[in-house]
UniProtKB/Swiss-Prot annotation:
InterPro entries: Metallo-B-lactamas, RibonucZ/Hydroxyglut_hydro, UPF0173, UPF0173_UPF0282_UlaG_hydrolase. PANTHER family: UPF0173 METAL-DEPENDENT HYDROLASE MJ1163, UPF0173 METAL-DEPENDENT HYDROLASE MJ1163-RELATED. Gene3D superfamilies: Ribonuclease Z/Hydroxyacylglutathione hydrolase-like. SMART domains: Lactamase_B (SM00849). This is UPF0173 metal-dependent hydrolase OEOE_1287. Disulfide bonds: none annotated. The keyword Cytoplasm does not apply. Belongs to the UPF0173 family. GO terms for molecular function: hydrolase activity.
Amino acid sequence: MKITYFGQSAFQIKTGKTTILIDPFLTGNKHTKVDPFDLNPEYILLTHAHQDHTGDSFDIARRTGATIITQTDYAQYINDILPEAKGCHAEGINFGGTFSADDFSVKLYPAWHTDARMVGNALVPVGVAAGMALTIEDKLIYDTGDTALFSDLKLVARKHPVDLALICIGGHFTMDADDALVAADFLQAKHVIPTHYNTFPSIQADPQKFVEQLPTGVGIIPDFDKEFDF
C-alpha cells in the first residue's frame, strides 16, 4: 500500500483498488499544500466530529461520491441533520463493529476524548470519538484518533498484531509525547507514526525526540505530502 501524511491527523492510503482518506483536515492545515479538489477517494474515515479531523470531508465526499465511515451517531447527523453535509452519505459503525469493503476493513475502538460540533447556533455532542483498526493487505494499521492515554489500548494488541500505529503526541487536547510512548508500548506496534502536533500553538511537540525514545527502527516521521510505500 502507499501512504501519504498531510499533517495533523490527515492521511491518504492507497490499496491496489481503493483510495482512503482519514480525517482530511487540509484547508487551514499549515503542514500540507495539497488541494482537496485533487483528492479522489472512494472512502473517508472520520475518527470524530471536531473540525481539525472532519476538515474538508463533506466537500470531498460531495464531489467524489466517497462514502464516509464513522461512529454511528455521527453518521446519522451527517445523513440527516448537518446542513453542511447535505449530499453526503455516511455509513455508521459502533465500538466493536466492522465495516468491510473489497480490499480493506475498519473496526471501531473507543478513544478517550470529547466530541461535539456546531449544529446551527448550538454546540451539540454528535456521537463519541473513536480509534480505528484498518486491515489492508494482511496488515493492521491502528489510528488512535484523538485520545488520552488509557490502558485498554493493550486489548488492541492482544487481538491484532499491530503493523503500524498512528499515535497523537501533541498534548493539551490529547495525550502528550510521554503518554504516547506508553501508548506505543501498549499497542506493541512494529512501526509508529506520531500525529497531531505543531499545527497550532497549543499542540507543540518534537516528533524526532519522540521517535528517538522508541525502540530502534520503530518510529517513522514521514515528509508531509510525500507518498511512501508500506
